[in-house]
């Protein structure tokens, strides 16, 4: 009996993350996703496959997440995935403590393609363009997906961790 109490907990059991209220709502309504651990502020985080982003984003909008506060990219390191991150907020009369959720879509480095959420939240316009410009994440269906910070002829994606910056870049027609 004493030996059984000292047995280590299997990693699969230790890694179980409790679902937050929004994740539970998505599960009840048949949306495929995975709950990740909440951040230090208690914001619920879910992982979504790229193919399911638009249906889930539409459902979250209908559920009351009417404001895309932030969309950005993350590079997990050379040879690893890129992540498209969406921070959504329920803006309502209860402005003291709005409900928030973060949606993460993990994408293969070789072909980082995800549907654009521009048609759900217009605030995604420049944010998706910046993620494209800096990380090379392609947002299918975006109405104007082109570089926003770097010159159009820039080669590469400057915020990728495996990016090698050129020794010299000539500015043309600078004045």
From Swiss-Prot:
NDH-1 can be composed of about 15 different subunits; different subcomplexes with different compositions have been identified which probably have different functions. The keyword NADP applies. It comes from the Bacteria. Belongs to the complex I 30 kDa subunit family. One of its GO terms (molecular function) is quinone binding. PANTHER family: NADH DEHYDROGENASE [UBIQUINONE] IRON-SULFUR PROTEIN 3, MITOCHONDRIAL, NADH DEHYDROGENASE UBIQUINONE IRON-SULFUR PROTEIN 3. NDH-1 shuttles electrons from an unknown electron donor, via FMN and iron-sulfur (Fe-S) centers, to quinones in the respiratory and/or the photosynthetic chain. The immediate electron acceptor for the enzyme in this species is believed to be plastoquinone. Couples the redox reaction to proton translocation, and thus conserves the redox energy in a proton gradient. Cyanobacterial NDH-1 also plays a role in inorganic carbon-concentration. InterPro entries: NADH_DH_suC, NADH_quin_OxRdtase_su_C/D-like, NADH_UbQ_OxRdtase_30kDa_su, NADH_UbQ_OxRdtase_CS. Its EC number is 7.1.1.-. It catalyses: a plastoquinone + NADH + (n+1) H(+)(in) = a plastoquinol + NAD(+) + n H(+)(out); a plastoquinone + NADPH + (n+1) H(+)(in) = a plastoquinol + NADP(+) + n H(+)(out). It is a peripheral membrane protein. Keywords: Membrane, NAD, NADP, Plastoquinone, Quinone, Thylakoid, Translocase, Transport. Gene3D superfamilies: NADH:ubiquinone oxidoreductase, 30kDa subunit (3.30.460.80). GO terms for cellular component: plasma membrane-derived thylakoid membrane. One of its GO terms (biological process) is photosynthesis, light reaction. The lineage of its organism: Bacteria, Bacillati, Cyanobacteriota, Cyanophyceae, Nostocales. It is found in: Cellular thylakoid membrane. It comes from Nostoc sp. (strain PCC 7120 / SAG 25.82 / UTEX 2576). The keyword NADP applies. This is NAD(P)H-quinone oxidoreductase subunit J.
């Amino acid at each position: 009996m004493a030996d059984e109490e000292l047995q280590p907990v299997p990693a699969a059991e230790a890694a179980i993350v409790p679902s937050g209220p929004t994740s539970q709502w998505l599960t009840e309504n048949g949306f495929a996703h995975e709950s990740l651990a909440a951040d230090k502020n208690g914001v619920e985080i879910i992982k979504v496959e790229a193919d399911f982003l638009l249906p889930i984003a539409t459902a979250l909008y209908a559920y009351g997440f009417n404001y895309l506060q932030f969309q950005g990219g993350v590079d997990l390191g050379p040879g690893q995935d890129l992540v498209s991150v969406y921070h959504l907020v329920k803006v309502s009369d209860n402005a003291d403590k709005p409900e928030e959720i973060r949606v993460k879509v993990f994408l293969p480095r070789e072909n980082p393609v995800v549907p654009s959420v521009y048609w759900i939240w217009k605030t995604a316009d420049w944010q998706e363009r910046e993620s494209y410009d800096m990380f090379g994440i392609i947002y299918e269906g975006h109405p104007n997906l082109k570089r926003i910070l770097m010159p159009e002829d820039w080669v590469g994606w400057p915020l990728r961790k495996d990016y090698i910056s050129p020794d010299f870049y000539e500015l043309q027609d600078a004045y």
